[in-house]
């Protein structure tokens, strides 16, 4: 395709050397013209625009109607054709054609071609003569010279014109064009070298990035993460560690998703301590543990006398975390009115204390966490969509323990080491004990595994923990209702869920799962042992487990059980469950 420079691509102003009268070539004008051309070629810019500007300047001191620069690749295929002398309104048929036969002869021979009348020359085909507008009544002269890079012909520089003067003028212009072609050749060489270097740089960059991804985080960074308390080498955890290393390098807001007990606070702290904010404060707050009025004061602070009991001014968590990281756990539990207040702080990084009109600006990185399905909450208008998008800039899904079983022995030994250190014991884990742990689903994830190890170690009378020491081997493990309930084993906190219609809510006794052990095949209890004594016991344990998981917040427990808060309150009274106060 022929490139015709638009008005925006043409130089704003070029000095126009004095043109010699026909037949009287001026050395001064030629030298001035070549000097100006060299300045154009040395200026940065796209090659096709640069060549078009060269041809435009060439018109000012060489008699020509049209000028062409044709470049070819290593296979001899036309790579770029730049033209001058055609108006933008010229018939496309002429603007996109070149005298092919003549150009091929120049490339093949590597010599200049000078013709006083193309109509009388066999080097020009009928198509070439038509392109140049030559006929028996209109003679057209043609000059073409090769463009070389080193010793290789890479293109041609050609002009045509209505002949005026003697043939010596053709020879003079041919020598002049040869000098211009030589300068163009040097420019093309530099452009190709630069393009080759840039392409190689991109290839090297892609290769290095791929190696970085394949190798994962450097050993030093992995060791640092292990020091933060993240233990394991399973594929699922390794993938998470790689993301933690990458995320820690930025200041983006992070949303940690995952079931309860998967270590969201531990991951948040690891991100903070691996970031440039590591020496700044790491402040945490459980949003579900406080009423809305207290939550606002905790996050934003308050002035003296702002409310009853505010005997002095107090900084909020945002102020305390300035230049550091604020970890907001259970963010899915905050009310819609408070969501709007939090959104403003996340967007503007500014707020007012309770009881004050003074705006405080902070620099805080927020890491939020939830085990709730926020997509479902947004669909039900329980969670603001704009806040969802604000906190979910970089979502990280923490794998449940059942998806990283190879980490169970490492975690169990670490928890036992911690227990021994705190209690002056020297217990060990037998192989049979590891087999028991590996067969369990652990719906409470790492937290449940830690509790299991601590409980078993506390009750162990020997010097080592064996299979029979575990509660599940004695028919006393009641985690089965947790695993079978809707909120465990069936729910992916990272995937959207369908809303539960009110008519689908069924009383507890009708939804209780059949009693069975949490452990996988290979019964741990003696034959005939009753693990759960009837549906009533299972119902009570389901309610207790849901209340404990929700921090004894009835509304949250109701969501876990698929019931209404009123039904949960009835179940608490029915089974005589005492509500724990914090």
Curated annotation (Swiss-Prot):
Residues 16-27 have a biased composition (Basic and acidic residues). It comes from the Bacteria. It holds the Pfam family Sigma54_activat. Residues 46-188 form the GAF domain. This is Nif-specific regulatory protein. GO terms for cellular component: protein-DNA complex. Residues 230-458 form the Sigma-54 factor interaction domain. Coiled coil: none annotated. GO terms for biological process: nitrogen fixation; phosphorelay signal transduction system; positive regulation of DNA-templated transcription. Residues 1-11 have a biased composition (Polar residues). Residues 1-28 are annotated as: Disordered. The keyword Hydrolase does not apply. Disulfide bonds: none annotated. Residues 459-539 are annotated as: Inter-domain linker. Required for activation of most nif operons, which are directly involved in nitrogen fixation. SMART domains: AAA, GAF. Residues 554-573 bind DNA. ATP binds at residues 258-265, 321-330. Residues 540-582 are annotated as: C-terminal DNA-binding domain. GO terms for molecular function: ATP binding; ATP hydrolysis activity; cis-regulatory region sequence-specific DNA binding; DNA-binding transcription activator activity; metal ion binding. The keyword Cell division does not apply. A divalent metal cation binds at residues 472, 477. Interacts with sigma-54.
């Amino acid at each position: 395709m022929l490139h015709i420079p638009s008005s925006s691509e043409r130089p704003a102003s070029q000095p126009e050397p004095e043109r010699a009268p026909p037949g009287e070539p001026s050395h001064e004008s030629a030298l001035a013209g070549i000097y100006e051309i060299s300045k154009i070629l040395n200026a940065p810019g796209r090659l096709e625009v640069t060549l078009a500007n060269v041809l435009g300047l060439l018109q000012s001191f060489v008699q020509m109607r049209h000028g062409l620069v044709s470049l070819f690749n290593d296979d001899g295929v036309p790579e770029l054709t730049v033209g001058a002398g055609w108006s933008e309104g010229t018939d496309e048929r002429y603007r996109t054609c070149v005298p092919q036969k003549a150009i091929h002869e120049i490339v093949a021979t590597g010599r200049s071609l000078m013709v006083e009348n193309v109509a009388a020359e066999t080097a020009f085909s009928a198509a070439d003569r038509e392109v140049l507008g030559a006929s028996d009544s209109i003679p057209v002269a043609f000059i073409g010279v090769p463009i070389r890079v080193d010793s290789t012909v890479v293109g041609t520089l050609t002009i045509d014109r209505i002949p005026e003067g003697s043939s010596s003028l053709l020879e003079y212009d041919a020598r002049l064009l040869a000098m211009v072609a030589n300068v163009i050749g040097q420019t093309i060489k530099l452009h190709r070298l630069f393009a080759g270097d840039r392409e190689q740089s991109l290839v090297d960059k892609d290769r290095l990035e791929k190696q970085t991804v394949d190798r994962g985080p450097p050993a030093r960074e992995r060791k640092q993460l292990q020091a933060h308390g993240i233990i394991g080498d399973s594929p699922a955890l390794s993938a998470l560690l790689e993301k933690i290393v990458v995320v820690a390098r930025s200041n983006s807001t992070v949303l940690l998703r995952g079931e309860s007990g998967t270590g969201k606070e531990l991951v948040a702290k690891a991100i903070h301590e691996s970031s440039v904010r590591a020496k700044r404060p790491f402040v945490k707050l459980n949003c579900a543990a406080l009423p809305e009025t207290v939550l606002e004061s905790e996050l934003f602070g308050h002035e003296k006398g702002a409310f009853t009991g505010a005997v002095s001014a107090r900084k909020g968590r945002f102020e305390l975390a300035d230049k550091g990281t604020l970890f907001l756990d259970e963010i899915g539990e905050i009310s819609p009115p408070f969501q709007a207040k939090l959104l403003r702080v996340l967007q503007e990084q500014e707020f007012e204390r309770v009881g004050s009109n003074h705006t405080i600006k902070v620099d805080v990185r927020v890491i939020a966490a939830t085990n709730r399905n926020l997509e479902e909450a947004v669909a039900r208008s329980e969670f603001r969509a704009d806040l969802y998008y604000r906190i979910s800039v970089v979502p990280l899904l923490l794998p449940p323990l059942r998806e990283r079983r190879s980490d169970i022995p490492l975690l169990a030994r670490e928890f036992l080491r911690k227990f021994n250190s705190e209690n002056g014991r020297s217990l060990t884990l037998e192989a049979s004990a590891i087999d028991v742990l590996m067969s369990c689903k652990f719906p409470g994830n790492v937290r449940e595994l830690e509790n299991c190890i601590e409980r078993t170690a506390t009750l162990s009378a020997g010097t080592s923990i064996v299979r029979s020491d575990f509660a599940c081997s004695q028919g006393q493990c009641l985690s089965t209702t947790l695993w079978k309930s809707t909120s465990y084993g069936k729910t992916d906190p990272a995937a959207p869920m369908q809303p539960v219609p009110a008519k689908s809510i069924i009383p507890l006794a009708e939804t209780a799962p059949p009693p069975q052990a949490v452990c996988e095949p290979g019964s741990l209890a003696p034959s005939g042992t009753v693990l759960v004594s009837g549906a009533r016991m299972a119902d009570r344990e389901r309610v207790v487990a849901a209340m404990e998981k929700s921090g004894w917040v009835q509304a949250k427990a109701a969501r876990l059980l698929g019931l209404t808060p009123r039904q949960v309150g009835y179940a608490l009274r029915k089974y005589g469950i005492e509500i724990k106060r914090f």
